[in-house]
């Protein structure tokens, strides 16, 4: 991650305080809202189809998280996503547990036919399911789960990221032991971080929100998503150091994530300009 890049993104966020319309997972709703506040933005969480277009219109970006789906929620995601597309606002799709059921696969396919995401943030299993839905290859019935159980080789993750990015014509961030970001033309591997990020519920959901926030700046989609992914790994690394220094547990690690992220973005926004 370029230091200048993250400083410029941080400055822009703190200047404009982007509002993110989050149609998100109720399991992680509070963490997503707190993450956005810590990073310098804010969340609006309207999810009824009677209001989602109106809310989308006064926000700066839209996050579509399909965790805990039902028919009404998917319809609301479609309406909000289409409105964001029409306004030229960034849309991030987080296809939580995409392969967990036939219902989820069918509804996700419906969503993808109606809305064009600017970026997708997913785990390895979800990326495989996305590619299978979009290309009619592989067997999606083999895949499932909100937490990825796949352990693909680095080269294979890169290929899946590139395939998904090309099929969707967007930037894709696949998270795991190492993260891979690709727009189909350029691909980068992100390393570092702390494995404890995978021991808390919502680490991926929070990263998806951070990607949405970073996309609300004058930065290319690839650079914005790459910067968000790299910063989240740096945040986890420092949160882990503080947790270890205190000889504390996973709950303290969770809390430190918010503190560290706020400090990193406040520092960079103040010291560049």
Where are these regions (language model features)?
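Conserved phosphate/ATP/ADP-binding segment of small-molecule kinases
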Residues: 104-187
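Short, small-residue alpha-helix embedded
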Residues: 129, 199-230
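Short, small-residue-enriched loops and turns at beta-alpha junctions
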Residues: 69-72, 97-101, 180, 197
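Short pre-catalytic strand/loop immediately N-terminal to key active-site residues, enriched for Gly-Thr
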Residues: 190-201
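Charged C-terminal helix
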Residues: 233-273
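Short, well-structured alpha-helical segments that form the helix of a local strand-helix-strand
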Residues: 160-165, 221-236
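Conserved N-terminal subdomain of the carbohydrate kinase-like
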Residues: 2-93
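Glycine/small-residue-rich loop that forms an oxyanion/phosphate-binding "nest" at active or ligand-binding sites
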Residues: 73-122
């Amino acid at each position: 991650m370029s230091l200048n890049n993250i400083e410029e993104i941080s400055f822009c966020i703190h200047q404009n305080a982007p509002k993110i319309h989050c149609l998100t997972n109720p399991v992680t709703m509070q963490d997503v809202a707190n993450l956005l506040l810590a990073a310098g933005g804010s969340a609006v969480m309207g999810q009824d189809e009677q209001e989602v277009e109106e809310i989308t219109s006064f926000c700066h970006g839209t996050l579509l998280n399909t965790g805990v789906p039902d028919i009404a929620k998917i319809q609301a995601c479609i309406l909000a996503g289409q409105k964001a597309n029409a306004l030229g606002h960034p849309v991030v799709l987080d296809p939580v547990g995409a392969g967990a059921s036939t219902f989820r696969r069918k509804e996700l396919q419906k969503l993808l036919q109606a809305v064009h995401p600017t970026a997708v943030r997913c785990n390895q299993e979800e990326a495989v399911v996305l590619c299978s839905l979009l290309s009619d290859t592989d067997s999606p019935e083999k895949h499932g789960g909100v937490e990825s159980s796949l352990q693909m080789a680095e080269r294979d993750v890169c290929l899946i990221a590139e395939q998904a990015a090309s099929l969707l014509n967007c930037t894709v961030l696949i998270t795991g032991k190492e993260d891979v970001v690709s727009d189909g033309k350029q691909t980068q591997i992100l390393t570092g971080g702390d494995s404890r990020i995978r021991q808390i519920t919502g680490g991926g959901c929070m990263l998806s929100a951070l990607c949405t926030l970073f996309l609300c700046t004058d930065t290319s989609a690839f650079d914005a998503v790459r910067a968000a992914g790299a910063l989240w790994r740096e945040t986890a690394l420092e949160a882990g150091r503080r947790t270890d220094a205190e000889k504390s547990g996973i709950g303290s690690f969770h809390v430190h994530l918010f503190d560290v992220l706020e400090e990193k973005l406040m520092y960079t926004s103040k010291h560049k300009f």
